[in-house]
Swiss-Prot record:
Residues 1-18 form the signal peptide. The gene is ilys-6. The keyword RNA-binding does not apply. Belongs to the glycosyl hydrolase 22 family. Type-I lysozyme subfamily. This is Invertebrate-type lysozyme 6.
Length: 138
């Protein structure tokens, strides 16, 4: 029974994260490959407006042999599957920082996406989270 319950909970978290990814994508770019934009002194690129440091933290998905990290970041950010993999990997890497906050998977994903590894604990990310909830995610 315990194993079955764990499987159901794992499916629910994955499903919530998939819906949440769509809401974050919509909030950041209307889910379009928008290229790079200046964002508080550094560039944010693509579907999820990913910064270079975030791309490095998410494990540099899609980086090709011989490709510079910067070129891979710009390209990956404008490819929906690659960018989604990056956001999901970033969430998986830093979600443990939010243990004990009582926040659901989507709130953790959204607030960390907006505010960095401990974004779930920053009051500055509450407005972003409210915007995600306004898109129908929770």
């Amino acid at each position: 029974m315990f194993v079955k319950l764990c499987g159901i909970l794992a499916f629910a978290v994955t499903y919530a994260s998939s819906d949440c990814l769509q809401c974050i994508c919509k909030k950041e770019s209307e889910c379009k490959p928008v290229g790079c934009n200046d964002d508080v002194g550094s560039l944010s690129c693509g579907y999820y407006q990913i910064k270079l440091s975030y791309y490095k933290d998410c494990g540099q998905p899609g980086k090709r042999a011989g490709e510079s990290v910067e070129a891979a970041w710009r390209r990956c950010s404008d490819e929906l599957d690659c960018a989604s993999t990056c956001v999901q990997s970033y969430y998986n890497r830093y979600k443990k920082q939010c243990a004990g906050t009582g926040q659901g998977a989507c709130e953790i994903m959204a607030r960390n996406h907006n505010g960095g590894p401990r974004g779930c604990k920053k009051s500055a990310t509450l407005g972003y989270w409210n915007g995600i909830k306004g898109l129908g995610c929770s």
